[in-house]
């Protein structure tokens, strides 16, 4: 359960596919324009509830509650063995070895 004042992430549909501008490319027109916003929760709620938040710039927005205390996650994907081999080859060429003399 999320409490009033918690830092949260919400999701909101800004424009449905039918509301998109005519000059938008066809593949873009097929999907809604979505927005994810972080802010302080204005009332107690459960994940999935429609809630209102106040952003750091004091805007009040409404949307579906997705996460409490959201954080950034990032990685470079799964290990690729070929890149390790290439790294060894580059090191050999750059810093010496029989083939580099």
From Swiss-Prot:
InterPro entries: OrtA. This is 2-amino-4-ketopentanoate thiolase alpha subunit. Belongs to the OrtA family. Heterodimer with OrtB. Its EC number is 2.3.1.263. The keyword Transferase applies. Completely inhibited by p-chloromercuribenzoate (p-ClHgBzO) and acetyl-CoA, and partially inhibited by N-ethylmaleimide. Involved in the ornithine fermentation pathway. Catalyzes the thiolytic cleavage of 2-amino-4-ketopentanoate (AKP) with coenzyme A (CoA) to form acetyl-CoA and alanine. It is strictly specific for AKP. It comes from the Bacteria. It catalyses: D-alanine + acetyl-CoA = (2R)-2-amino-4-oxopentanoate + CoA. It is an enzyme of class 2 (transferase). Keywords: Transferase. GO terms for biological process: ornithine metabolic process. GO terms for molecular function: transferase activity.
């Amino acid at each position: 359960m999320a409490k009033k004042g918690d830092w949260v992430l919400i999701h909101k549909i800004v424009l449905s596919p039918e509301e998109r501008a005519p000059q938008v490319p066809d593949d873009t027109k097929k999907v809604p324009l979505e927005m994810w916003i972080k802010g302080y929760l204005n009332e107690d709620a459960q994940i999935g509830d429609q809630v209102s938040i106040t952003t750091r710039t004091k805007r009040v927005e409404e949307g579906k509650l997705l996460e409490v205390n959201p954080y950034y996650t990032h990685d470079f994907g799964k290990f690729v063995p070929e890149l390790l081999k290439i790294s060894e080859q580059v090191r050999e060429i750059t810093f010496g070895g029989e083939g580099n003399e």
